[in-house]
Amino acid sequence: MTANTLKRKISLRIKRKRKIRANISGSAVCPRISIFKSNRTIYAQAIDDTNSKTLCASSGTALKIKANKDGAAILAKDFAEKLKAAKISEAIFDRNGYLYHGVVAAFADALRKNGIKL
């Protein structure tokens, strides 16, 4: 993959991200769950946009998991436990410009299985 192709893919993802963020917003009762994936790991955080605060976060580096579907399911289980400890049962899912496919879809499905309403 050439450098220009990579820059174009990243800029298109950022463009999709901005369009998504224009329409969704989280609150303390129903936070926005944002996911970020790199080649090595996955990160997730619950964000209260009205107060600009991160309510809770979970990372794949702390759990020593890879950025694949199995790792996404493990991360979602850990993240759901943190959300339940913070008394959050409902949230808005922000796919952060990524396609709702693969790791992102596996993370969202695992959150739903662990009792978080998206």
Swiss-Prot record:
Record's GO cellular component terms: cytosolic large ribosomal subunit
Domain of life, source organism: Bacteria
Database matches in Gene3D superfamilies: 3.30.420.100
Signal peptide stretch: none
TM region(s), chain numbering: none
Record GO terms (molecular function): 5S rRNA binding; structural constituent of ribosome
UniProt keyword list: Ribonucleoprotein, Ribosomal protein, RNA-binding, rRNA-binding
One annotated GO biological process: translation
Keyword field contains Transcription: no
PANTHER family tied to this protein: 39S RIBOSOMAL PROTEIN L18, MITOCHONDRIAL (PTHR12899), LARGE RIBOSOMAL SUBUNIT PROTEIN UL18M (PTHR12899:SF3)
Family note: Belongs to the universal ribosomal protein uL18 family.
Subunit relationships: Part of the 50S ribosomal subunit; part of the 5S rRNA/L5/L18/L25 subcomplex. Contacts the 5S and 23S rRNAs.
NCBIfam families with a match to the protein in the record: L18_bact
Role according to the record: This is one of the proteins that bind and probably mediate the attachment of the 5S RNA into the large ribosomal subunit, where it forms part of the central protuberance.
Protein name as annotated: Large ribosomal subunit protein uL18
Encoding gene, per UniProt annotation: rplR
